[in-house]
């Protein structure tokens, strides 16, 4: 039985916890919240550290030096981070769900995730190039695709 099936999130080692991240890059996108409805909207404006082809952070180990507001996902805050996509492994496991079929821990690579359209690969622009963020709201797959 795989560690994510036999352990709670709180029981996982730091290495196991980190490996849950599929590397989709969606958490690194700028998001908007409608003032009236409180609806959440993702944009294709990506963090300046996000590699647009690999969907990985270019300076992960020292990202807080470059982006102090970068969020650390922990067992203590996972239930508060409602802006994480429904497909996020942390959210799914916290809700008692399984990993999606395309998750790198199940497939052995990120390729299935990219092919399923579940990553930001090739879909984003550098946030520094965005003038009007509302023009960058996206509708591409943000929900679960199992």
Swiss-Prot record:
It holds the Pfam family CxxCxxCC. It comes from the Bacteria. Belongs to the UPF0260 family. HAMAP family: UPF0260 (MF_00676). This is UPF0260 protein Sbal_1871. It comes from Shewanella baltica (strain OS155 / ATCC BAA-1091). The lineage of its organism: Bacteria, Pseudomonadati, Pseudomonadota, Gammaproteobacteria, Alteromonadales.
């Amino acid at each position: 039985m795989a560690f994510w099936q036999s352990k709670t999130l709180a029981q996982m080692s730091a290495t196991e916890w980190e490996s849950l991240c599929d590397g989709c890059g969606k958490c690194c996108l700028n998001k908007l919240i409608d003032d009236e409805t409180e609806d959440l909207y993702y944009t294709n404006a990506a963090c300046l550290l996000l590699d647009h082809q690999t969907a990985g952070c270019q300076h992960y180990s020292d990202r807080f030096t470059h982006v102090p507001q970068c969020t650390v996902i922990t067992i203590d805050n996972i239930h508060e981070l409602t802006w994480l996509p429904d497909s996020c492994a942390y959210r799914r496991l916290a809700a008692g769900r399984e990993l999606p079929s395309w998750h790198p821990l199940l497939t052995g690579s990120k390729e299935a995730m990219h092919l399923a359209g579940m990553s930001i690969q090739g879909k984003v622009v550098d946030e520094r190039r965005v003038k009007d963020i509302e023009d960058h709201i996206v509708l591409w797959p943000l929900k679960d695709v199992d």
